[in-house]
């Protein structure tokens, strides 16, 4: 019987059961994966120019501080004014957990998922799913997240102040 599996890209002895998430090379064992002499990532040898000046990663991906992200403007003037004049929102948006969950809400709102009957999910259903997702992260939700709760409260207060 002929084996159709790909050989280990490091030792080339047996079938490569696993795949390196950084470089994509197939490997057979943890020993091959951690072999620093044979398994080298080309990206880590040559750091990209200018990356260190713009991004600072602080301990276990808790906070990412990017000087480029601070100078961006938002789509609407009202949201941009709120963002530019709120140090609290800017500080909360540095946390990866806030960015992650807001990106998920954005994906829900901008998705083109088929719902089975009408072809595409309508905007009302997308808004409902996004609100339900946020509600699970807010106070009393099953996945309560203090940073998301604080972000939502501050943003709602600022939006209500603009409406008045």
Curated annotation (Swiss-Prot):
Zinc fingers (HIT-type): which spans? Answer: 8-49
Annotated PROSITE patterns: ZF_HIT (PS51083)
What GO cellular component is one of the record's annotations?
nucleus
Query: What molecular function terms (GO) are annotated for this protein?
Result: zinc ion binding
The UniProt keywords, alphabetically, are: Metal-binding, Zinc, Zinc-finger
Q: One short Pfam family name for this protein?
A: zf-HIT
Recorded hits in InterPro entries, A to Z, give:
Hit1_C, Znf_HIT
The answer to keyword Metal-binding applying to this record is: yes
Q: Name one GO biological process term.
A: snoRNA localization
Q: Which residues bind Zn(2+)?
A: 8, 11, 28, 32
An additional note in the Swiss-Prot or TrEMBL entry is: Present with 2730 molecules/cell in log phase SD medium.
Instruction: Please report the name of this protein according to its UniProt entry.
Output: Protein HIT1
Which species is the source of this protein? Saccharomyces cerevisiae (strain ATCC 204508 / S288c) (Baker's yeast)
